[in-house]
Amino acid sequence: MSDLIELQRNYLIGVLNQIETKNNLKFLIIDKTVETILSYLFLTPQELLNNVTSVDLIDSPTRKGQSSIEAIYILEPTKYNINCIDADFMVRPPKYRRCHIRFLPGLTNPIFQFFQSKRYIAQNLESFKPIELGFFVKESQFFETLQMEHSLQVFFNNNCKALIPTNVRKIVGSLVSLCVITGEYPIVRYSVSNPVEEEDARNGNAVVNANSLTRSIANAFQIAIDTYARNNPDFPPQNTERPRSILIITDRTLDPFAPILHDFSYQAMAYDLVANVDTQKDIYHYSAENEAGEQEEKVSKLVDLYDPDWIDLKHQHIMDANEYIQGRIKELIAKNPLLVDRSNVKNTTDLLSVVAHLKDFDEERRRLILHKTLVDECLGENAERKLADISAIEQNLSGFGMDFSGEKIKHIIDDLLPALAMKEPTILDKLRYIIAYALFRGGIIELDFIKLLNFIGVTHEHENFQQYLKIFRNYDLIDFKLIKDKPKDKPFQKEWFHDTLVNDPNIYHTSRFVPAVGNILSKVIANPLLLSEQYFPYLKDKPIELLNEEEFQAGLANTSANSSSSLRNPRHKAAWTTKSSNIKKNIPRQRFFYYVIGGISIPEIKAAYDQSNLKNRDIFIGSDEILTPTKFLDEVERLQNPREFFKFKEDQRQQVNPPDFLLREMKPVAQPVSHVHLKSQDNSPKSGTSSPKAAGSLKSEPPEKEKKRSKFSRFLKRKSHHDK
């Protein structure tokens, strides 16, 4: 299975190693955005210091230079960063001998002209190239576009429409980076909510329609990746038999159920239910017993790079995760009988206390205590709110009105009302049930919404009454008219792409829902003809031939996905033209890219992993941000708020002038110490001297964001266990 963390790490190291310097000494200067990228790629600073001599934040007051050593700058292309670089060479002696500048995606023409105007940079510039690091690798198969915030507002709030072009360029930069790092030149398909309007638009009969967002991003990406391929003859790689990849671009309107249903996998429950999980930073705050028997406050990262147990556990059903952790605890204790006093062990809580007192197992013990504590919190919230007991109503509503046996439920409201009458679920839980019911019905009148709110105790006098009503109304802005004007109005018409599982003894009753992500990927992997071209048209490259009935059945049998021909790359031959009997077992797996505009839920990310494992394919899924159910409903409620409310970074005054300390004359410092671990010099061709004019082919990207000044401590001074 390909690992996006490893792929991005190797790409970055490759960029660093291609830059040859005297004695192979290199100072790396970064900004806060790149620091965050590095935090997802390198477990310890030493991993990065094997490739460079030192790493510093560009605006750190403790950054020391050396006028005989060359510097590599990997930064966002902002006026502030450019001025900081210029200041490094304005002082005498200059901080560094020469500079190699690598800007992240986002270089606009105005910023490029500003860059060209800097005299000291021009005099000391050794090389200047883009670096394709347009996303954070949050997980081995999930990536997040850089510097996006409130993406649902950007794309669906009419007051924020002016921000769309900037953020489209960010997404395009993210997708191009993905393709460069993976060496893929994908076939592009995009989702369409209204095929009739889409056909008119493609024929030039309509300028704007409901599908313009996905199509515009697909078009912009195609132009950008084609430009990259023209400017880089070695892209895509020629020496591989991997079938051509497929990129599917969708948006948040494709699946309204995924962000609101209660999901019972471990990560989804933790991010939905546990208040002490910081979902923005992927950090869990908790208390645990230490060796002295005292409760101690802890902070742990829930990130793939730091925690192999998290990788194994996060997508398991909570009951399976609990069983796994208990088994691991018992196994650890069983392997160390001489270190354990079993006399007081009566339950799993006692087992956890025993583990806390085990010595010589610090890291394993830390992870077991962490996950046992978090799993217990999830189970506790579930028990207190009776969520699993009520889950059948959600599964039935999202399952087209069918129960676990596949039987159609005649009066589903009779199941909903008892759930709403229960005292254990929170008001927000019940609100999610009501929205699921309205989606199932294709909309209900506002009076019925008010009656249901009153039924759960939210009357006109309730402090959140107007807030909840606004959520119902604002669903119309994301293409779901939940509130019908009249009782006799027809339900809204919507093509559903999610699915439900019935009569399957191998699944939990709480987990029948299949997000649209999983259903779409399942179809396109099995055979592209299974995925409606009407709702998922090809942007450019279309399969070179159609299957006849016999070939279609063969395609279903061998689960090969389609590709299209390309004169550029021989591996772009249609996958189904090779008979299954001739397929080599060692042929690399086809890759599928899936992007959701407007935010993604954790169950949708999990669905991509599930299909990757089931279909034996590499799947990388990305979005602008992760949406928990609470965050999603908050964003929907604010879809009519003015742009000023959100305080977008684009709307804030950005720092331009460099810090004063960078302009002070620096004193010569000692030669670098000889014991620094350096990577042996490679045989890569030297990055030739190039003027800023040589970068004229760089993609235009959005204005970048304000930089913060702080010490480079979060990455370089990170504790080895990432746990306080």
Curated annotation (Swiss-Prot):
Name of the gene: SEC1
Record lineage: Eukaryota, Fungi, Dikarya, Ascomycota, Saccharomycotina
Any single Pfam family the record assigns to this protein: Sec1
Gene Ontology MF term list: SNARE binding; syntaxin binding
Subunit structure: Interacts with MSO1.
Listed GO CC annotations: cell periphery; cellular bud neck; cellular bud tip; plasma membrane
Function: Involved in the final stage of protein secretion.
Further comment: Present with 639 molecules/cell in log phase SD medium.
Region ranges (Disordered): 675-724
Record-stated family: Belongs to the STXBP/unc-18/SEC1 family.
Keywords assigned: Protein transport, Transport
Biased composition (Polar residues): 681-692
Protein name: Protein transport protein SEC1
Regions of compositional bias (Basic residues) in chain numbering: 708-724
Matches recorded under InterPro entries: Sec-1-like_dom1, Sec-1-like_dom3a, Sec1-like, Sec1-like_dom2, Sec1-like_sf
GO BP, sorted A to Z: exocytosis; intracellular protein transport; positive regulation of vesicle fusion; vesicle docking involved in exocytosis; vesicle-mediated transport
